[in-house]
A protein has these predicted regions:
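Short amphipathic coiled-coil heptad-repeat segments
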Residues: 1-11, 176-194
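A short glycine-rich beta-alpha junction/loop motif
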Residues: 29, 94-100, 132-155
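A short beta-sheet element
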Residues: 43-44, 54, 61-122
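Extracellular/lumenal glycan-associated surfaces
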Residues: 2, 156-170, 174-175
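DNA target-recognition patches
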Residues: 22, 30-60
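Non-catalytic DNA-recognition/assembly elements of restriction-modification systems
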Residues: 5-28
Length: 194
C-alpha cells in the first residue's frame, strides 16, 4: 500500500505481472518502405508526441499489422531508449516499429499504466530485465511481461491516472511558455546588442 493516497481509497493493492493484466505486443520487425502519406509510422523517437512525418502505405499496414494501436492503448520504448511510455489518444490508424511495445488492457486505466511504468520500482524492474550487452540495449517482450506492478481498484487507478495526466498537461503548458520566453530572450539579445 503506498504511503500517499487519495481520500476514500483503503483497499489493498495487488502485485501482478504486466502480462497478467495486459496483452503485450511489439511492432513490425521489417524496415518499412516510407512514403509521403498513408498510415503514420511510429518509432522510439516519436514516443513523446506519438506523431511522425514517416508514413507507410495502407496496403503495407493491412499486411503487417493484425494487432493495431487504438485509443486507450499504451506504447512503451523497448530498444535504445527503454521504459518511456505514452497513451494513444487518437482514433487514426498507427503503425509502429519493433522498438515499441504495445499494451492492450481491459484491467488497467491507460494513464495509470503509463504512470506505473514511470514509477521508480517499475523502472528498476525494467532496467534489471534489460539486455545491456546488446547494442542498442533492449528489453525483450517476454521480459516486459514479467515486470511486476502494483494494481489498485479501477476507481483508484482512474483517479491516479487523471492526476498524472493533469500534471503532464501542466508541465507541457509551462514548457511551451518557457520555450517561448527563451526565444524572446534570444531575439532581444540579437536586437539590443550590436
Amino acid at each position: 500500500v503506498p504511503e500517499l493516497r487519495f481520500p476514500g481509497f483503503t483497499d489493498d493493492w495487488e502485485e501482478r505481472k504486466l502480462n497478467e493484466v495486459s496483452d503485450i505486443y511489439d511492432g513490425t520487425h521489417q524496415t518499412p518502405k516510407y512514403q509521403d502519406d498513408g498510415v503514420m509510422f511510429l518509432s522510439v523517437e516519436n514516443i513523446k508526441t506519438l506523431t511522425s512525418n514517416k508514413f507507410i502505405s495502407r496496403e503495407a499496414f493491412e499486411d503487417e499489422f493484425k494487432i493495431r494501436p487504438q485509443r486507450g492503448d499504451v506504447l512503451m520504448t523497448r530498444i535504445g531508449d527503454i521504459g518511456t511510455a505514452n497513451v494513444v489518444e487518437t482514433d487514426e490508424d498507427l503503425a509502429y516499429y519493433v522498438s515499441l511495445a504495445l499494451f492492450k488492457s481491459e484491467e488497467l486505466n491507460p494513464y495509470f499504466l503509463q504512470a506505473s511504468i514511470y514509477a521508480p520500482f517499475v523502472q528498476d524492474q525494467i532496467w534489471k530485465r534489460t539486455l545491456h550487452i546488446a547494442f542498442p540495449k533492449k528489453i525483450n517482450k517476454n521480459e516486459i511481461g514479467q515486470v511486476p506492478i502494483n494494481v489498485p481498484t479501477l476507481a483508484e487507478q482512474t483517479k491516479i491516472g487523471s492526476f498524472f495526466k493533469q500534471l503532464d498537461n501542466t508541465i507541457t503548458l509551462h514548457q511551451r511558455k518557457l520555450d517561448l520566453l527563451k526565444e524572446q530572450k534570444k531575439g532581444f539579445l540579437q536586437k539590443m546588442f550590436v
